[in-house]
């Protein structure tokens, strides 16, 4: 007897949204034996999934999707169908409204509207999208007027680059609008999750996800403030953090050019939106949002002029992923262009970046400065010949490493002056 047969629930699952979370989730469920309908309103995305031509840096994702489709258990299309369970994995971006940043529930509301014609008594709706506290309860109140349904929130907790591994191994928190909803959702996830599954109410589950990312955002803000102080007083923040973290109860994260991605840079605002007491959270978010401008000012200070050519290495929000959402690089590039700089970006990982991407040679040709904004392994592993090639093309042998990843000695041997964000000893 399979887990699906044993649980006796949700033989048919409709997953709305086939992005970074929805596609792996739909594929994982299909492999477990569920009849899965994967839905995305983007026809191009649906076509690429069907043809297995979509781009991804996730290890083994293409193999998983291929297996799910070939099994006959995963069908991909642009419209929902009747199902026992509906899992919603759509974006919930942050928008500015009356001077305040708030969660934009447009995609979530459209997803809910799209499944309403197919809802039947006894159906379960699971929301994986990150949402402000109280959203799941609000959705339940609206939908339960006409039918007896169950609603739960099960926020994703995965790290891009390791999604499949963490989808299976990470613990999960599931919050239901009632105990039955939480239990029903648990029966779905325990078919593939090997980590522990903790049950609670919906509002607590919503807050747990926001707290996880807010904790990291506040910690990074502290590191970024330390970096600014280090430059001011003449110490190397990276050395200081490493030594401070020798204390068994201290774990300061790393500073950088800002915080990006669709979680850490967004989620804290959902708490601020709901509470006037979130003063520290707001301050941390504002500090991290200020870092791209800090980097731009540092560039101008280093090259000692207010115009020139800047080569940007790395436009994704973190290293070795293709995701450019909320990337600090976008803000850095935008500000530089606004101030009259010529900017060329190089990133072989990135997709869907708002500005054109160039080859390495194109980016560095005639550059006044190279700026590292993402910790891709490629940049860490530049060898002597790579650096010689770059040195032969730049106008000035100057590099600003905002992630502290370069082999400084190699670059200096080729005549480069290497600056590191937060290193006040070598400013």
Curated annotation (Swiss-Prot):
It comes from the Archaea. The active site is at residues 209, 263. SUPFAM superfamilies: 6-phosphogluconate dehydrogenase C-terminal domain-like (SSF48179), NAD(P)-binding Rossmann-fold domains (SSF51735), UDP-glucose/GDP-mannose dehydrogenase C-terminal domain (SSF52413). UDP-N-acetyl-alpha-D-mannosaminouronate binds at residues 157-158, 209, 213, 216, 247, 249, 260, 317-318, 403. Disulfide bonds: none annotated. It is an enzyme of class 1 (oxidoreductase). It holds the Pfam family UDPG_MGDP_dh_C. GO terms for biological process: polysaccharide biosynthetic process. InterPro entries: 6-PGluconate_DH-like_C_sf, NAD(P)-bd_dom_sf, UDP-Glc/GDP-Man, UDP-Glc/GDP-Man_DH_C, UDP-Glc/GDP-Man_DH_C_sf, UDP-Glc/GDP-Man_DH_dimer, UDP-Glc/GDP-Man_DH_N, UDP_ManNAc/GlcNAc_DH. It catalyses: UDP-N-acetyl-alpha-D-mannosamine + 2 NAD(+) + H2O = UDP-N-acetyl-alpha-D-mannosaminouronate + 2 NADH + 3 H(+). Keywords: NAD, Oxidoreductase. NAD(+) binds at residues 20-21, 40, 45, 92, 130, 325. Its EC number is 1.1.1.336. One of its GO terms (molecular function) is UDP-N-acetyl-D-mannosamine dehydrogenase activity. Belongs to the UDP-glucose/GDP-mannose dehydrogenase family. Catalyzes the four-electron oxidation of UDP-N-acetyl-D-mannosamine (UDP-ManNAc), reducing NAD(+) and releasing UDP-N-acetylmannosaminuronic acid (UDP-ManNAcA). Homotetramer; probably dimer of dimers. This is UDP-N-acetyl-D-mannosamine dehydrogenase. It comes from Methanocaldococcus jannaschii (strain ATCC 43067 / DSM 2661 / JAL-1 / JCM 10045 / NBRC 100440) (Methanococcus jannaschii).
């Amino acid at each position: 007897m399979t887990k699906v047969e044993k649980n006796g629930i949700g033989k048919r699952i409709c997953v709305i949204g086939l992005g970074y979370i929805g596609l792996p989730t739909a594929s994982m469920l299909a492999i477990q034996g569920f009849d899965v309908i994967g839905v995305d309103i983007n026809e191009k995305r649906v076509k690429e999934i069907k043809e297995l031509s979509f781009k991804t840096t996730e290890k083994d994702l293409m193999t998983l999707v291929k297996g799910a489709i070939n099994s006959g258990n995963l069908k991909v299309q642009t419209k929902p169908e009747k199902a026992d369970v509906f899992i919603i994995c759509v974006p919930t971006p942050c928008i500015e409204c009356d001077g305040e940043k708030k969660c934009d529930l447009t995609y979530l509301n459209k997803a809910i509207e799209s499944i309403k014609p197919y809802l039947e008594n006894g159906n379960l709706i699971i929301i994986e999208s990150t949402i402000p506290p109280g959203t799941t309860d609000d959705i339940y109140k609206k939908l339960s007027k006409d039918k007896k349904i169950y609603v739960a929130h099960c926020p994703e907790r995965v790290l891009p680059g390791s999604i499949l591994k963490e989808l299976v191994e990470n613990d999960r928190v599931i919050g239901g609008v009632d105990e039955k909803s939480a239990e029903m959702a648990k029966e779905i996830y325990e078919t593939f999750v090997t980590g522990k599954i903790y049950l609670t109410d919906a509002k607590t589950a919503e807050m747990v996800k926001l707290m996880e990312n807010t904790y990291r955002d506040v910690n990074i803000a502290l590191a970024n403030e330390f970096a600014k102080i280090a430059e001011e007083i003449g110490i190397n923040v990276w050395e200081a953090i490493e030594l401070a973290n020798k204390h068994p109860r201290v774990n300061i994260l790393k500073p950088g050019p800002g915080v990006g991605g669709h979680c850490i840079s967004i989620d804290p605002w959902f708490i601020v939106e709901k509470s006037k007491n979130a003063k520290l959270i707001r301050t941390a978010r504002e500090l991290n949002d200020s870092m791209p401008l800090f980097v731009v000012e540092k560039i101008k200070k280093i090259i000692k002029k207010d115009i020139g050519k800047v080569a940007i290495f790395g436009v994704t929000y973190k290293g070795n992923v293709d995701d450019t959402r909320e990337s600090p690089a976008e803000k850095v590039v935008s500000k530089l262009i606004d101030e009259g700089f010529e900017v060329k970006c190089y990133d072989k990982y990135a997709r869907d970046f708002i500005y054109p991407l160039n080859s390495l040679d194109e980016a560095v040709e005639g550059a006044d400065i190279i700026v590292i904004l993402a910790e891709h392994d490629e940049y860490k592993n530049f060898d002597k010949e790579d650096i010689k090639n770059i040195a032969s093309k730049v106008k000035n042998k100057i590099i600003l490493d905002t992630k502290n990843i370069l082999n400084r000695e190699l670059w200096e041997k080729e005549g480069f002056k290497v600056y590191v964000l937060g290193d006040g000893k070598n400013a």
